[in-house]
Regions:
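A structural signal for small-residue-enriched, beta-sheet-centric alpha/beta enzyme cores
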Residues: 2-12, 46, 56-62, 67-128, ...
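Phosphate-interacting basic helix/loop segments used at nucleotide- and nucleic-acid interfaces
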Residues: 19-34, 131-151
Length: 250
């Protein structure tokens, strides 16, 4: 088994709408002495993808609904931000105190529909999740492949966990690789057949990448080298989102 390396790509400028992320990442990696190579997995923070795609809103332009105003007044929240959270949601899964757990239009269940104000680039601005993170990942991967680098791409975002404290990064978009590694049908060294074991390697890689990234360190991209990923150009992140009919808790 080859050793696994994880390193961050720094030196990226503030991302503006229309930015060509693949080109910028390739240049920053080369400038930092760590050029991308075939077989790499490139994990890109969703926030810079959203900025490049113009997925930001100015809260001053938002007219909150009566519910957003009432709920925000009760819990000391910004009604414009609450309205954005509601607009980005398919439904509210849990509303407990000042916390809104929502299901996004992508099918993700997370706090505040993934809407975030940190590192937004300006006061009073909020960053939304990409409209189609798989399409975003495919576009970045296509840019890498055009430059001669066959690398897989994961778009990551930070999610909380229902049963544990602390947050971790998970994959919300993928291109070029299978997101799940199945052991079903295989046999362990003692002869026991695996019946249900499936590893979400996309989430594991996203979480590992966060160890060298972070909101305050200005390292929005990480490269994982040495992971033997399974090629799949038709893969989508929807395959890791559990269908509601099989969800025991929603």
């Amino acid at each position: 088994m080859s050793p696994l390396q994880i390193f961050g790509i720094s030196g990226l400028p503030e991302i503006e709408p229309g930015a060509e992320l693949a080109t910028m990442i390739l240049r920053a990696a080369t400038a930092g002495g760590q050029s991308l190579a075939g077989g790499d997995v490139v994990v890109v923070t969703s926030k810079i993808v959203s900025k490049a795609e113009g997925r930001t809103v100015e809260l001053a332009d938002i007219d909150p609904s009566p519910f957003a105003r009432e709920w925000s007044a009760q819990w000391g929240k910004d009604p414009a931000l609450t309205e954005v959270v509601l607009r980005e949601s398919k439904r509210v899964v849990r509303q407990i105190g000042p916390v809104l757990i929502t299901e996004t239009h992508h099918g993700f269940v997370c706090a505040n529909s993934g809407v975030d104000q940190s590192s937004s680039g300006a006061q009073g601005r909020a960053v939304l999740l990409p409209l189609d993170s798989d399409a975003s990942a495919r576009a970045i991967r296509a840019g890498f492949v055009a430059a001669g680098v066959n690398a897989a791409v994961i778009i990551s975002d930070t999610f909380g966990r229902a049963w544990r404290e602390g947050q971790t990064d998970v994959a919300i978009g993928i291109a070029g690789m299978q997101p799940i590694l199945s052991y079903i049908g295989q046999v362990d060294p003692h002869g026991h057949e695996f019946m249900v074991q499936e590893l979400c390697t996309a989430d594991e890689l996203a979480g590992a990448a966060e160890l060298v990234k972070g909101n305050v360190s200005r390292v929005p991209v990480a490269v994982i080298r040495g992971h033997q990923w399974q090629v799949d150009d038709s893969a989508t992140i929807s395959s890791v989102v559990r269908d509601q009919s099989r969800d025991l808790f929603r």
